[in-house]
């Protein structure tokens, strides 16, 4: 069963809030999605104004990004969290009814 795009965005926002210094490769690995899909998702989130990306020098030869949720991103994550919890409660109730049969 494929995840909805909102689920991917919710998971990316959650991981970024937990660790703004996470690398794209680590984030993609943790979320079990391709690097290309993650890049697409990050561009979408940035385009919606939900995250900011800033460069910083990890060492003198390599730049890394830091990902920060904007106030709009924090509000969107809260909304997605509520929707996710409602979905899980609905699934729980359906499974509970199924088991009672």
Segment roles from a protein language model:
Residues 29, 46:
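Alpha-helical residues within the helix-turn-helix
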Residues 2-9, 23, 54-77:
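Short, cationic-aromatic polyanion-contact patches
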Residues 10-14:
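Pre-recognition alpha-helix immediately N-terminal to the DNA-recognition helix
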Residues 75-101:
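Amphipathic alpha-helical dimerization/coiled-coil segments
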Residues 25, 36:
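Key DNA-contact positions within bacterial/archaeal DNA-binding proteins
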